[in-house]
Curated annotation (Swiss-Prot):
Membrane-crossing segments per the record: none
UniProt entry keywords in alphabetical sequence: DNA damage, DNA recombination, DNA repair
Protein name (database record): DNA repair protein RecO
Family: Belongs to the RecO family.
Record's GO cellular component terms: bacterial nucleoid
Length: 243
């Protein structure tokens, strides 16, 4: 087995046998990695606490046939210790971790931009400077954009004619003009659409100045769009407080 080192974020863990744990990581260079942490559930484990969701780690692994093996790990940032103390931030973070795994999906396919987005999102959540819903929605929109599913917000998703347009259709890919609008389209407020644009662009000044009703409407649109475009959806979004 070859030895390699990477930087990663723990997305999910699963107990294996009596003492081991399977860890799913999104790493900077390798992409999505599943590895076994041997003996990490034992009380005297050298690095059990470092292999928990939300933890940003420096990790050394042996490449295996089906699962890699963690041989060394150091904590770079323990975001979970902050997020678990605040329910809105915690649930937003859980949704981000699940989304990252769903968006990347293919193991060991480098996904640097997705890694950087997740790292930045967790760091911003932990800092607590913005509404957790805004941080989550900004992450979801950008992650989808990197994956090739960016919603059309300033032009018609079907014909490309410049907006502004009045209707939004998740199954069509975003805003649609009056000629292209399919059945099931909704009419979001211009302010909610403007907030989506601000979050996608990283315009935090505009996002932070948004009204509560617009944040709630924006969150609903983003959640619906994400669930439509990701296979099997993101279950943890149900836990996020949207109002």
């Amino acid at each position: 087995m070859s030895l390699y080192r990477d930087e990663g974020i723990v997305l999910r863990t699963q107990d294996l046998g009596e003492a081991d744990r399977i860890v799913t990581l999104l790493t900077r260079r390798t992409g999505l990695v599943r590895a076994v942490g041997k003996g990490v559930r034992r009380t005297r484990s050298r690095f059990g606490a470092r292999l928990e969701p939300f933890t940003h780690i420096d990790v050394q692994l042996h490449a295996g046939k089906s699962l890699d093996v963690v041989t060394q790990v150091d904590t770079l940032h323990a975001y979970g210790s902050v997020l678990v103390t605040d329910y809105p931030r915690y649930t937003a973070g859980v949704a981000m971790l699940e989304t990252a795994e769903k968006v990347v999906s293919v193991e060991k396919d480098p996904a640097l931009r997705q890694f950087l987005l997740l790292w930045g999102g967790l760091r911003t959540l932990a800092e607590g400077a913005h509404d957790p819903r805004l941080v989550l929605d900004a992450y979801l929109l950008r992650s989808l954009a990197v994956a090739g599913y960016a919603p059309a917000l300033e032009e018609c998703a079907h014909c490309g004619v410049p907006g502004p347009h009045r209707e939004f259709a998740v199954h069509a890919g975003g805003m649609v003009c009056s000629l292209c609008r399919p059945a099931g389209s909704v009419k979001p407020s211009p302010a909610a659409v403007a907030l989506m644009v601000a979050l996608l662009r990283g315009d935090w000044e505009s996002a932070d100045a948004s009204a509560e009703r617009d944040r709630t409407e924006c969150s609903g649109l983003v959640a619906a769009y994400l669930q439509w475009h990701l296979e099997n959806g993101v279950r943890s979004l149900r836990l996020v407080e949207r109002a």
